[in-house]
């Protein structure tokens, strides 16, 4: 590989300690490089643990290393050493882990050490500084390099963090692929819960031809103290805090349990007045505008954190910030803390030792237990970390009754012991002790063939078909499984040929090159991340772009290829059943018949028959679809069609504790619209719908959208973090206009249904000075010459909305033409919109000015 020229301004090298230490020439011995890196460690006043020292020495001897040491034992420093050696020798290195937030965190840390010009990042959506000497990415990005380039992959050093994800059912294949193809690389595999790594030692040595060394240790920088208690959670927490063992992370295995625990703890006082004042100071400027925001704010001001995937990202970030300041005594969260959640913890309290794993409730695995408990104890802050396990609730209750009986035989006889709930998977102190010493289970191969994998391999300049067969042959699978993978690969290949995404190059045109050619007509960032994307491309061609419902039908297809957000769909079905039950009661149907009919109901599935029928046809012709299935649903579509804001939808379905779930689904729909739907399929109405969705995301929690846009900007460079500011929802005119139009139709909808009171309520303070009687009189005047106000797709077409900014462009005059069945379209509603207020509140604020015949403005 040619020598890499280091970029960056030399005047600022002193700001980046490892960039400053890079030798002028790449012709430098390992001993010299090691000495330079040890100088860096000395400057940071760090002292290497034996395992760290051993691993670094082995890496500088050009060996592969499998590093299995506990959480907090400095594995990141070993990875940094590998990056330094690689860059000093003019090569490229790549760091990968499973979580985008961790990739971002590592990216920022490496930028500080090596300078931002020398570090890139990729998380699956887009990339920043892709060709930098150091790249931080998710495992799937590395897997794509490994599939597309094989042993020609541009990275000589490969660091795979959280390597136990190798056994993840869905994503594990991404951790395996580099170990099958990147034969010219050196590997550093990192995990605190590897189990027995001998198999990987042999495989990595076989692949690279270089020795692979296992460096392992059970010695923790901060030792753990374990205890099992039969006291209620509130008593346990009070005792821990009194003993100076905070911050405490209270572990639950469902988001709802974590949220309920935070609510239950509000009756206890964990923080002093001074601490609460400090919390309020840090929270100053934070916006809690979502429906659940008031609850989150209340918990935080009381010194109680909450942390789970159902929260909006901005709230999780705030919780982490407060926790890092040492101001939160208790954090109620889920077991996701085991995967790199940036929350400092002294004590971990396990509320249970069993959890639902998707199919059944079972005792925690050794790996799950060690991942969770390993977060207790903060290196540099704590001398010891604490792990507390709660006994089952019925055991705690029985223990309380026995304590009240105080050995009184009569009371003991009368006592009725509480029984565990039906189907309960219990645990005991013995269970707890066994988990403490248990070795993590062996990592199981999750290799699988997908059309995305096939596309990457077939894009190689040489014989991609042969490379695909070799990939399957070298996989860590059984002989029987390899046979099935070959069959599936053939089915996938035929499907890609049939869809013309892959073409066979005629012999006369090959000229010694590849036998295959990828179709390059799809947009540059065309995404095949979703297994059903090929179906989406097919189905888009079957719907009429001139149909008045074309835009929402496109959205339905996008939603159909995404995973089901179950909590939202359950609430939708519940609402459908409630409405059906009320209607059947009114019709006088017998109870048994009502119950029978309820069982037949399902949540809304627009174009249900079209989607199922076209998908069945697609699956019949393309057996590679395998276990995949289409999932029609209407969440983003329902919001769009019914003019619902994010807050409206949360209230409609009581999703306060699952705001993050709704945000992620909407974000996924937006990404499919933006990245997978071909530009040729995007009519003006689709583009407007896409802008509306972007506006909803930006106004709710801009972090996901900002990351998406930042990563799509090739010129973006990291800077020091600044205090968080509210997102400017007015910066994108198209998005902001779409939000204004949604607010207009939130007013128009009840007005069209002759409910002026509800219409005024929709405007809130923007209806000041107006009365329901005034609206009713104007509506009567309108209806005297028009049948009704239309609310269909034509009525909401953007061409019927007119904007006129004032000279300062801080206030817009907005006119909305009312569309009627006679198509006279001669009335309008006028509003003013204050952009300053919109920026402050994170949503457009409409003031009603006038309703009447169209006139020049």
Whereabouts are the PLM-identified features?
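Conserved C-terminal RecA-like helicase domain
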Residues: 94-96, 104, 111-120, 255-330, ...
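Compact beta-sheet-dominated globular domain cores
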Residues: 819-857
């Amino acid at each position: 590989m040619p020598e890499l020229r280091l970029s960056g301004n030399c005047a600022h090298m002193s700001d980046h300690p490892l960039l400053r230490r890079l030798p002028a020439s790449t012709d430098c011995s390992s001993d010299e490089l090691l000495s330079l890196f040890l100088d860096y460690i000395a400057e940071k006043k760090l002292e290497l643990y034996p395992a760290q020292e051993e691993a670094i020495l082995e890496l500088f001897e050009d060996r592969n290393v499998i590093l299995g040491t506990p959480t907090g034992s400095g594995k990141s420093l070993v990875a940094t050493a590998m990056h330094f050696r690689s860059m000093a020798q003019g090569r490229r290195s790549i760091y990968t882990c499973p979580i985008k937030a961790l990739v971002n965190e590592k990216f920022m840390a490496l930028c500080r050490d090596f300078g931002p010009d020398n570090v890139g990042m990729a998380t699956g959506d887009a990339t920043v500084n892709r060709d930098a000497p150091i790249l931080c990415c998710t495992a799937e990005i590395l897997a794509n390099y490994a599939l597309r380039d094989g042993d020609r992959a541009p990275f000589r050093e490969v660091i795979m963090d959280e390597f136990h994800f190798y056994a993840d059912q869905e994503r594990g294949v991404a951790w395996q692929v580099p170990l099958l193809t990147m034969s010219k690389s050196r590997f550093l595999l990192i995990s605190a819960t590897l189990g027995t790594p001998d198999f990987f030692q042999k495989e990595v040595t076989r692949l690279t031809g270089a020795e692979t060394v296992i460096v392992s240790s059970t010695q923790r920088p901060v030792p753990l103290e374990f205890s099992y208690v039969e006291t209620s959670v509130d008593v346990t927490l009070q005792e821990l805090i009194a003993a100076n063992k905070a911050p405490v992370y209270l572990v639950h295995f469902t988001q709802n349990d974590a949220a309920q625990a935070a609510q239950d703890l509000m009756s206890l006082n964990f923080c002093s007045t001074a601490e609460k004042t400090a919390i309020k100071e840090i929270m100053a400027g934070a916006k809690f505008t979502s429906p659940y925001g008031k609850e989150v704010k209340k918990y935080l001001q009381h010194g109680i954190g909450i942390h789970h995937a159902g929260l909006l990202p901005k709230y999780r970030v705030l919780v982490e910030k407060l926790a890092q300041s040492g101001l939160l005594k208790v954090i109620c969260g889920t077991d996701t803390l085991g995967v790199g959640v940036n929350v400092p913890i002294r004590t971990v309290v396990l509320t249970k030792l069993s959890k639902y794993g998707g199919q059944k409730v079972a005792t925690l695995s050794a790996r799950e237990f060690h991942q969770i408990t390993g977060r207790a104890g903060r290196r540099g802050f704590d001398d010891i970390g604490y792990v507390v396990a709660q006994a089952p609730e019925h055991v705690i209750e029985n223990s309380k009754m026995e304590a009240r009986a105080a050995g009184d035989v009569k009371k003991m006889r009368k006592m009725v012991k509480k029984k565990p709930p039906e189907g309960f998977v219990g645990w005991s102190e013995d269970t707890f002790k066994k988990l403490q010493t248990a070795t993590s289970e062996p990592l199981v191969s999750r290799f699988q063939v997908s059309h995305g994998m096939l596309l990457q391999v077939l894009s190689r300049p040489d014989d991609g078909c042969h490379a695909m067969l070799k990939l399957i042959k070298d996989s860590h699978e059984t002989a029987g499984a390899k046979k099935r993978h070959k069959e599936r690969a053939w089915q996938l290949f035929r499907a890609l040929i049939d869809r013309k995404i892959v073409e066979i190059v005629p012999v006369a045109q090959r000229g010694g090159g590849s036998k295959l050619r990828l179709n390059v007509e799809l947009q540059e960032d065309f995404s095949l991340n979703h297994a059903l994307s090929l179906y989406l491309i097919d189905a888009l061609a079957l719907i009429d772009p001139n149909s008045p419902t074309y835009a929402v039908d496109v959205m339905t297809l996008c939603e159909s290829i995404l995973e089901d957000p179950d909590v939202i769909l359950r609430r939708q079905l519940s609402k459908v059943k409630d409405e059906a039950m009320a209607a059947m009661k009114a019709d006088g149907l017998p109870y048994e018949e009502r119950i029978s009919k309820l069982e037949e109901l399902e949540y809304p599935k627009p174009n249900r028959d079209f989607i199922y029928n076209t998908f069945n046809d697609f699956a019949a012709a393309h057996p590679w679809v395998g276990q995949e299935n289409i999932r029609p649903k209407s969440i983003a579509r329902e919001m769009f069609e019914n003019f619902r804001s994010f807050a409206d939808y949360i209230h409609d379905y009581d999703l306060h504790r699952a705001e993050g779930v709704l945000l992620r689904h909407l974000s996924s729909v937006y990404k499919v619209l933006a990245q997978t739907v071909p530009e040729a399929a995007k009519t003006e109405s689709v583009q407007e719908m896409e802008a509306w969705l972007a506006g909803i995301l930006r106004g709710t929690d801009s972090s996901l959208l900002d990351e998406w846009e930042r990563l799509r900007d090739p010129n973006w460079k990291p800077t020091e973090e600044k205090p968080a500011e509210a997102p400017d929802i007015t910066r994108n005119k198209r998005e902001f206009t779409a939000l204004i139009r949604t607010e207009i139709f939130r007013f128009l909808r009840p007005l069209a249904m002759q409910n002026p009171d509800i219409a005024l309520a929709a405007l809130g303070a923007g209806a000041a000075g107006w009365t329901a009687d005034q609206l009713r009189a104007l509506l009567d005047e309108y209806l005297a010459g028009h049948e009704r106000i239309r609310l269909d797709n034509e009525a909401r077409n953007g061409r019927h909305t007119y904007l006129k900014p004032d000279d300062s462009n801080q206030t817009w005059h907005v006119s909305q033409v009312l569309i009627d069945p006679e198509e006279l379209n001669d009335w309008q509603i006028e509003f003013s919109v204050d952009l300053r207020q919109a920026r402050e509140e994170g949503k457009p604020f409409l003031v009603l000015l006038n309703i009447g015949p169209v006139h020049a403005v």
